[in-house]
Amino acid sequence: MTQSSDPAQAAAANATSTTKPYAARPDAIDWQRADDSGTRSATFNGTRDAGQTFTYAFHIPAGFWDRPHSHSGAARIFVATGELRIGYGNELEPSEALSYPAGSYLYVPAGAVHFDGADVDTTIYGVSTGPWSTDYT
């Protein structure tokens, strides 16, 4: 295990390992990708390669909605902060989305067409198995 006096640094150094301890707090995530929309993502551990389990974080800024899409793998999602809104179908219909506050758990099957967004800044944690891709309808 990496030795560091800073627990966040030590955790980040172990992020891709599946054999070393790792911890992350919502306010101290080492975001690896950011989009102009304000969304951000990070892979905590594992890889998105075929047959590999990985954990990730995804941040959705207040007011953002992602158009209908599906993923190649099932996602097990935990709402860490804020409130995730999600609906199913090929049309973006925010009024049809259900709300899931922090502490909620969701299972989204592979291939399920859905749209998601947030009215408040929201961070989710997820667990899935690769290969991972997002396909927009």
Spans of features found by a protein language model:
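Membrane-topology and secretion signals of cell-surface/extracellular proteins
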Residues: 35-39, 66, 113-116, 135
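Short acidic-glycine-tyrosine-enriched beta hairpin
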Residues: 47-49, 84, 90-111
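Short beta-strand His + acidic residue motifs that chelate non-heme Fe in jelly-roll/DSBH
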Residues: 66-68, 86-87, 108, 113-119
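Double-stranded beta-helix
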Residues: 19-22, 95, 115-137
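A structural connector/turn signal
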Residues: 55, 65-67, 74, 95, ...
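A short, N-terminal "cap"/entry segment at the start of jelly-roll beta-barrel domains
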Residues: 3-54, 97
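Glycine- and acidic-residue-biased ligand/ion/polar-headgroup-sensing regions
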Residues: 61-64, 71-91
